[in-house]
Amino acid sequence: RERGIISFGSGVTDPYQNLESTHRITARCAELLADSIHALPAQVMTKSSLVARDLPFWRRVNDRAGFILLVSLTSLDEQLREAMEPGASSFASRIETMRVFKKAGCRVGVLAMPLLPGLSDSDASIRALYAACADICVDFVMPGGLTLRPGRQKEFYITALRAFRSDIVDSTLDLYRNERPSGMPRQVAVAALHRRIQSIRLEVSMLF
C-alpha cells in the first residue's frame, strides 16, 4: 500500500491560525499522529509561532517517521509585517520557532514567498533574509515572487498597498499590467528576481 506524507496547511490556510490557540484542532491531529499505530510522516506549513506549543507531538512524529516544519518568512521588517500580515506572529518569533525545531532534530524549511515588489524583494532585504536562514541552518529555502490574479485578489492587495506605500502602487500595477490569469508579473521581472536570488544564495553559501 502506498504511503504518503500528511500535510497541514497550504498557500491559502494556516493550521495554526489564531483560533487554534483555543480550539486545538491541529493539536489533536498532531497527538493522534504521534500515537498512531501507523507511523506516518508529516509536514506543517505555517507563519505562526504557535506551532511550538505542539513540539512534543511533532518531535514524536519526527522520531517515528519524519517531520518537516515549513515556515512562511519573507522579510525581517516588522513594520512591513504589521502592515501586510496583521495578526501574524512576528518575524523574530518565527525565526526563534525554527531554531527550536532544529534543535529538536526536525527538518526546517523556509517558504520565502511571496517576495513583495518594492517591499521585500530588494537585494538588501533578500540578503538579510538568507543570512538569518543560514544562521539557523535551515534545511532549505523556497523563494518566490508575488502573483496577483485579476479581480478580487489584485484589488485587495492594491488597496492594502495604497494604504501602506502609495508611492509604489503605480510601479506595481505596471508589473502586472498584462493581467495574466495566473497572476504572474511580466516575465522580464520574474527572470531578474530569480537571477538576483541565485546570486545572493551563492553569496551567503546557501546552495539549495
Where are each of the predicted segments found?
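C-terminal accessory regions of radical SAM enzymes
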Residues: 153-155, 160-208
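Conserved AdoMet/S-adenosylmethionine-binding subsite of the radical SAM
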Residues: 1-172, 182
